[in-house]
Amino acid sequence: MGKTTKRMRMISNQIDRTKQYNIHEAIPLLKDHATVKFIESLDVAVKLGINARKSSQNIHSATILPHGIGRSIKVAVFAQGINVSIAETAGADLVGMDNLAAQITKGNINFDVVIASPDTMHLVSTLGQILGPKGMMPNTKTGTITQNIALAIKEIKSGQIRYHNDKNGIIHTTIGKINFESYQLIENLEALLRALKKDKPLQTKGIYFKKICLSTTMGPSLTIDQCSLSTLVK
């Protein structure tokens, strides 16, 4: 604990929490302070100008990051009939119906994403209280309820992330590992922001991207100067 406290105190002395950092300054700074013994993730928090109390302004969506997130994603698929072989051929880690539902009910959830074909939702819907709080319930908006099982698996395996805002209108997600090249992390961030811009609810007014912060798993959080990002996200 003492070492952690000393490390965080040293980092805190080098970070100006009132400053908005240029993205090309922020990434190297976060890399310099990633000194723990594992490869940390780079996380982003995007404060949006939405009213999260209104369902019409809530965002549930997905996008593909050009450089992935730095780890393999395990996919479970609810499928029956010909979709079983389609899912297996496409690279699903688990495929099933009642057996997969039983595994989930027992709390044995050793996968990251659940995909379901529409004809299996009568079963999947019974698992809502388990999958919902984990953010794993299949959803048409994120493409995880689909007729095209093979495409959904391919997109997820190739670096797709799914995201939704919390009650404060903030999107929290991972955009890669801190050992990525700086340009890869920047391009992943800008891909997310472009996707969020497309997701912008029609009812929102005023500033949409209110605040963008980057942090590593065990490191400090830096507020990003939006002027240093691509004009596509302004």
Curated annotation (Swiss-Prot):
Pfam families: Ribosomal_L1 (PF00687)
PANTHER family hit by this protein: 54S RIBOSOMAL PROTEIN L1, MITOCHONDRIAL, LARGE RIBOSOMAL SUBUNIT PROTEIN UL1M
Purpose of the protein: Binds directly to 23S rRNA. The L1 stalk is quite mobile in the ribosome, and is involved in E site tRNA release. Protein L1 is also a translational repressor protein, it controls the translation of the L11 operon by binding to its mRNA.
Listed HAMAP family: Ribosomal_uL1_B
GO molecular function: rRNA binding; structural constituent of ribosome; tRNA binding
SUPFAM superfamilies on file: Ribosomal protein L1
Protein name: Large ribosomal subunit protein uL1
Subunit and interaction comment: Part of the 50S ribosomal subunit.
Top-rank lineage group of the source organism: Bacteria
InterPro entries: Ribosom_uL1_bac-type, Ribosomal_uL1, Ribosomal_uL1-like, Ribosomal_uL1/biogenesis, Ribosomal_uL1_3-a/b-sand, Ribosomal_uL1_CS
GO biological process: regulation of translation; translation
Protein's gene: rplA
Keywords noted in UniProt: Repressor, Ribonucleoprotein, Ribosomal protein, RNA-binding, rRNA-binding, Translation regulation, tRNA-binding
Organism: Baumannia cicadellinicola subsp. Homalodisca coagulata
Cellular component, GO annotation: cytosolic large ribosomal subunit
Protein family (similarity comment): Belongs to the universal ribosomal protein uL1 family.
Listed PROSITE patterns: RIBOSOMAL_L1
This protein's record includes keyword Metal-binding: no
CDD domains the UniProt entry points to: Ribosomal_L1
Keyword Signal recorded: no
